[in-house]
């Protein structure tokens, strides 16, 4: 399947929102208390999940197109997704820690973690999530989202990205100029 820029943006928005909801539910259940959002944005969206969703889909498409044995393609895509998403998680964690002096996640209590930004346990979880995304979630999302007329999709994308941009700009200004907003730590 070939996706144009608008479809990539649409999936970025949907998976950023679904990732935020999934993490909120997971943290609430794991901590046995109502989870309060951590992060840079304050509007129920996590860009890392949106980027990772697109990256995973593209890795699976690339492997399906280039590796003719379907089992080998599946294994390569899953391992590629684990590697790519883990690398992205490490880079994002490192940048957020260095730039904003705040860790938004901390795997220091997990064995074999690297600088507490990544660990094998969560990397394997990314592999499982990539299989669920590609085999169950994404096919349903394609059907649901493509049922919406194109001009409405474009309008929605522009509106949501505008809100995200304003939110990010506002929070960046508050952090950089010390006006009270701070990232919520783990």
Sequence positions of predicted segments:
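Aromatic-rich, lipid-facing transmembrane alpha helices and their immediate juxtamembrane interface loops
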Residues: 1-186
């Amino acid at each position: 399947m070939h996706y144009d820029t608008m479809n990539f943006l649409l999936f970025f928005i949907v998976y950023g929102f679904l990732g935020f909801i999934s993490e909120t539910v997971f943290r609430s259940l794991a901590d046995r208390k109502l989870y309060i959002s951590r992060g840079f944005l304050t509007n129920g969206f996590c860009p890392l999940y949106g980027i990772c969703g697109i990256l995973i889909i593209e890795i699976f498409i690339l492997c399906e197109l280039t590796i003719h044995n379907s089992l080998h393609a599946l294994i390569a895509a899953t391992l590629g997704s684990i590697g790519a998403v883990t690398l992205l998680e490490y880079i994002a964690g490192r940048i957020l820690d260095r730039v904003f002096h705040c860790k938004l996640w901390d795997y220091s209590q997990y064995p074999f973690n690297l600088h507490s930004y990544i660990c094998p346990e969560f990397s394997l979880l990314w592999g499982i999530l990539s299989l669920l995304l590609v085999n169950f979630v994404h096919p349903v999302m394609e059907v649901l989202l493509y049922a919406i007329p194109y001009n409405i999709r474009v309008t929605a994308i522009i509106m949501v990205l505008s809100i995200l941009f304003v939110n990010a700009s506002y929070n960046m200004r508050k952090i950089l100029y010390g006006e009270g907003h701070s990232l919520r730590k783990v």
